[in-house]
From Swiss-Prot:
<keyword id="KW-0349">Heme</keyword>
<keyword id="KW-0479">Metal-binding</keyword>
<feature type="binding site" description="axial binding residue">
    <location>
        <position position="182"/>
    </location>
    <ligand>
        <name>heme b b562</name>
    </ligand>
</feature>
<keyword id="KW-0408">Iron</keyword>
<dbReference type="GO" id="GO:0005743">
    <property type="term" value="C:mitochondrial inner membrane"/>
</dbReference>
<comment type="similarity">
    <text>Belongs to the cytochrome b family.</text>
</comment>
<feature type="transmembrane region" description="Helical">
    <location>
        <begin position="77"/>
        <end position="98"/>
    </location>
</feature>
<dbReference type="InterPro" id="IPR027387">
    <property type="entry name" value="Cytb/b6-like_sf"/>
</dbReference>
<dbReference type="GO" id="GO:0045275">
    <property type="term" value="C:respiratory chain complex III"/>
</dbReference>
<dbReference type="InterPro" id="IPR016174">
    <property type="entry name" value="Di-haem_cyt_TM"/>
</dbReference>
<comment type="function">
    <text>Component of the ubiquinol-cytochrome c reductase complex (complex III or cytochrome b-c1 complex) that is part of the mitochondrial respiratory chain. The b-c1 complex mediates electron transfer from ubiquinol to cytochrome c. Contributes to the generation of a proton gradient across the mitochondrial membrane that is then used for ATP synthesis.</text>
</comment>
<feature type="binding site" description="axial binding residue">
    <location>
        <position position="196"/>
    </location>
    <ligand>
        <name>heme b b566</name>
    </ligand>
</feature>
<dbReference type="InterPro" id="IPR030689">
    <property type="entry name" value="Cytochrome_b"/>
</dbReference>
<feature type="transmembrane region" description="Helical">
    <location>
        <begin position="33"/>
        <end position="53"/>
    </location>
</feature>
<feature type="binding site" description="axial binding residue">
    <location>
        <position position="97"/>
    </location>
    <ligand>
        <name>heme b b566</name>
    </ligand>
</feature>
<feature type="transmembrane region" description="Helical">
    <location>
        <begin position="288"/>
        <end position="308"/>
    </location>
</feature>
<protein>
    <recommendedName>
        <fullName>Cytochrome b</fullName>
    </recommendedName>
</protein>
Amino acid sequence: MKILRKNHPLLKIVNHSFIDLPTPSSISSWWNFGSLLGVCLMIQILTGLFLAMHYTSDTTTAFSSVAHICRDVNYGWLIRYLHANGASMFFICLFIHVGRGIYYGSYVLSETWNIGIILFLTTMATAFVGYVLPWGQMSFWGATVITNLLSAIPYIGSTLVEWIWGGFSVDKATLTRFFAFHFILPFIITALVLVHLLFLHETGSNNPSGLNSDSDKIPFHPYYTIKDLLGILLLLLALMILALFFPDILGDPDNFTPANPLNTPAHIKPEWYFLFAYAILRSIPNKLGGVLALILSILILATFPLLNTSKQHGLIFRPITQTIYWTFIANLLVLTWIGGQPVEYPFTTIGQIASITYFTIIIILMPVSNTIENNIIKL
């Protein structure tokens, strides 16, 4: 009797992707975050779908509809807090996933890496438009400030901003289209995830040693399905602790006040996962320069395959680059902290130093350390 999963046209694809997939036997828990991101995406789509059933994308009722979800809908408060804190868990997993890719040299699989960058940007866009939907003070002013950055584009900037707003300010038309974008983008992300996996399975997974693992592969199921299951349980535990015990810890108190175009909050800031890019944006006095730096802070990830000159794969046997890598992580944490601080001395100066360091490490220090380590190997 033929095995169904190996012969059925549809099940065969699933089998080659998740069951009989040859996987390096040495991959560590840092490789769990890909599957955790998949789980986060499913949680976000499901909770988002239930929220969309009760939400109204109208400036007069949006804030009230979110309050209604929390007060009157069965377990509405739980669905809302799972969705809001699920976004934070999503970005934590995303940052670790990208960090692991840099540390272990996964960027040499350039197609997978580039699709990953597109996924990162799409996820950031989804989170941004989602943050506008509750129509609180920070939602409104965050949308106004960030969309207004496009006015820095020469010639077409002002027209472009008004086109995105659907008027002369952030208003009903803006909220309606942002809701439409927030609904459709997760499905685009899902399609991109499939392309990401397709490219990954063309080459096979990387592994911690950075060596060729063709001679040492094991089937994905049951070894890594069980391992992923443990990761998923820990993720759900962390999400539940966050949603049930500290639901508002990562939110902004200003967002409990309905949007008021006549009253600007003292400190306009985005969600915590955008603060590093926001700090880079604010550290440049010129508006257009700030916007370019903001975009480059993400797109610079695409330079990793191009600037990599190392004869070794990953950083596991490269102490100099390891030191630079962990300096880079510390620098990112500093940027995140600065992004949440007011625009005053000494925070502006620290932000400028951290922003320069961010780009210097990637463009100059890492390639230089690659060359030094290559020369050390020759000795």
